[in-house]
Amino acid sequence: MAERQVNMELSNDLKNLPASGDETKIVQEVYQFIVIRLGDENFGIDINYIDNILRMQQITRVPKVPAYLKGVINLRGEVIPVMSLRIKMGLSDDEIGRDTRIIILKIGEEGNVGILVDEVREVIKLTDSQIESTVGDNVSPESRRFVSAVGQNGEQLISILDLTTINLDDN
């Protein structure tokens, strides 16, 4: 009797499965990015790399370093180098304003590094289908080597930064 009931339940379960050839829903991975502004361009930074976002504060200059390395800050007892992402990417000099922020990134063995950005705009979610791995004409030539992909957020294009290219080395 119990065997017959199990067979009936299995039969009912099988009836609910999609038939061969039926469309099945494909689950896409969702990624979160913080959208920043540098000049007239919008860039996305994977939220997993972000440790902190700070208002602009005093940066202590360090002598004999590349121009893009603005100096260091002290964050809860940790000395963190701060670089100008604009200068590193070959864009115009920084324009420090009330929206300027220092984003503390967690980058591999280098530890934490701060980057100056003109503005932190928003947090967005993008799926695989919204991210194009080829970088087109929407990214300035100076920025291309720092961009790994382009995301489509509604009508807005977001250049996704490749954080492996944003290091403290002089290249």
List each language-model region with its residue ranges:
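An acidic, low-aromatic, low-complexity terminal/linker signal
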Residues: 1-171
